């Protein structure tokens, strides 16, 4: 069984508990009192040609184990805000990434930046749950959904005020994302079947993005050279988690990154 299959199997078990909390009913009851979502997609849409940073608050991963032992999500998020991130991503998956919805709630309340809920969405109830916990955007993974699900979930997210980053890994998934109406697409350089990483995946797929789509590169970015390559390839933003914890090159850059990489 692949990594992704294992994760999705667990997520489908979790959905039963989520539905027991009646997130749709709670959303309908509370929506008039919810703060407007901060524009995640708009934060990445610059006309200046600079590459923007989505900084990920990440404690662990299935491939690396614990990355940050002294994990304080709010402290990390505030640091990312200080270094010039345009948006944040927070892992909420418990079993495989040691994340938590509580981390997202705390980060969303502490920062001004828009926040993406990074998790594996397999049911509509998780979308309402995301809005209630303070997310401004969600991730939808093409490999985890049927095309009709993707289309329906994009519509539901829009109706609740959430932006959507649609994640792809190959040309077929990119075409599916475009056909179902995605306006912000992220290329995951990590293959979710075996967790191998190939940074060239993003640049290989970039020419096939629909016009006016926000293009994001995710995973495996470690050096200033990686960043320069993606900027030159025409990406609007990069999503970086582990690299910001391990690479002084990346934290030393002035974000958003200009043509001079200074």
UniProtKB/Swiss-Prot annotation:
InterPro entries the UniProt entry points to: Aldolase_TIM, Indole-3-glycerol_P_synth, Indole-3-glycerol_P_synth_dom, Indole-3-GlycerolPSynthase_CS, RibuloseP-bd_barrel
Amino-acid biosynthesis in keyword set: yes
The protein's enzyme class: lyase
Record-linked HAMAP family: IGPS_B (MF_00134_B)
A Pfam family matched in the record: IGPS
KW Amino-acid biosynthesis (keyword) present: yes
Matching SUPFAM superfamilies: Ribulose-phoshate binding barrel
GO molecular function: indole-3-glycerol-phosphate synthase activity; phosphoribosylanthranilate isomerase activity
UniProt record similarity statement: Belongs to the TrpC family.
Listed Gene3D superfamilies: Aldolase class I
Record GO biological process: L-tryptophan biosynthetic process
Enzyme Commission number(s) from the entry: 4.1.1.48
UniProt superkingdom: Bacteria
Swiss-Prot/TrEMBL keywords: Amino-acid biosynthesis, Aromatic amino acid biosynthesis, Decarboxylase, Lyase, Tryptophan biosynthesis
Record-given protein name: Indole-3-glycerol phosphate synthase
CDD domains for this protein: IGPS (cd00331)
PANTHER family per record: INDOLE-3-GLYCEROL-PHOSPHATE SYNTHASE, TRYPTOPHAN BIOSYNTHESIS PROTEIN
Record-linked PROSITE patterns: IGPS
Pathway as given in its UniProt record: Amino-acid biosynthesis; L-tryptophan biosynthesis; L-tryptophan from chorismate: step 4/5
Catalytic activity field: 1-(2-carboxyphenylamino)-1-deoxy-D-ribulose 5-phosphate + H(+) = (1S,2R)-1-C-(indol-3-yl)glycerol 3-phosphate + CO2 + H2O
Organism: Chlorobium luteolum (strain DSM 273 / BCRC 81028 / 2530) (Pelodictyon luteolum)
